[in-house]
């Protein structure tokens, strides 16, 4: 796995955020905003891991975000982050039925996020896009791109915005998405792969938390 300088800086930043959130959790386990930051950092860090570790880290992120929801059930940013985690996880899976289970969960959480914040255009577009995800996953796997990634081991986080051109992105082995969201006081790039980039490239950050 090769990292650019920007990748390495992001890795350090989010690892620092993860450690800070872990320490803060010991002081105040009922801080839902801290749990949101923790889950967001794990979501970002999963991009830099080999596939098996990335899946575990995504599950850990979901766990932290679900815990935030037990404290604040209406926290729509957490719902949206969980949906992105399930989407990323689905693209790490070759079996279409197993992937569909993750996509279905992603759709459920995108819908819940939109229900909590119905004026959020990003949530609405995310929900619309998620309905097309299983078909894109199948195309991705049929074209052999999925086997390249699933058999390749490492994550492919790239610095800055990932290219919207799928073939160019795959050659560079980038799996960033252009989902961007400002939920933790910084911009997080939701992890994913080039197929999801093509679907999500027009999305911008949601409004600040209410």
UniProtKB/Swiss-Prot annotation:
Post-translational modification: The N-terminus is blocked.
Repeat region (TPR), residues: 42-75, 83-120
Family matches, as Gene3D superfamilies: Tetratricopeptide repeat domain
Location of the protein in the cell: Mitochondrion outer membrane
InterPro entries: TOM20_imprt_rcpt, TPR-like_helical_dom_sf
Gene Ontology CC annotations of this record: cytosolic ribosome; mitochondrial inner membrane; mitochondrial outer membrane; mitochondrial outer membrane translocase complex; mitochondrion; nucleus; TIM23 mitochondrial import inner membrane translocase complex
A Pfam family this chain is assigned to: TOM20_plant
Record keywords, A-Z: Acetylation, Membrane, Mitochondrion, Mitochondrion outer membrane, Protein transport, Repeat, TPR repeat, Transmembrane, Transmembrane helix, Transport
Family: Belongs to the Tom20 family.
Protein name (record): Mitochondrial import receptor subunit TOM20-2
Organism: Arabidopsis thaliana (Mouse-ear cress)
Gene behind the chain: TOM20-2
């Amino acid at each position: 796995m090769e990292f650019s300088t920007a990748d390495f800086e992001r890795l350090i930043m989010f690892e620092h955020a993860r450690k800070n959130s872990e320490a803060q959790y010991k002081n105040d386990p009922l801080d839902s905003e801290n749990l949101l930051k923790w889950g967001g950092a794990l979501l970002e860090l999963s991009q830099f891991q080999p596939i098996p570790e990335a899946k575990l880290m995504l599950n850990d992120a979901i766990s932290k975000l679900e815990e935030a929801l037990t404290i604040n059930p209406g926290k729509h940013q957490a719902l949206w982050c969980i949906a992105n985690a399930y989407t990323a996880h689905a693209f790490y899976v070759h079996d279409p039925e197993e992937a569909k289970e993750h996509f279905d969960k992603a759709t459920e959480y995108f819908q819940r996020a939109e229900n909590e914040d119905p004026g959020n255009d990003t949530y609405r577009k995310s929900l619309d896009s998620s309905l097309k995800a299983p078909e894109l996953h199948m195309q991705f796997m049929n074209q052999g791109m999925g086997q390249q990634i699933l058999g390749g081991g490492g994550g492919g986080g790239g610095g800055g915005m990932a290219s919207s051109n799928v073939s160019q992105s795959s050659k560079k082995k980038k799996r960033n998405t252009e989902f961007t969201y400002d939920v933790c006081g910084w911009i997080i790039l939701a992890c994913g792969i080039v197929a999801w980039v093509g679907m999500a490239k027009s999305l911008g950050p949601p409004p600040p938390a209410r």
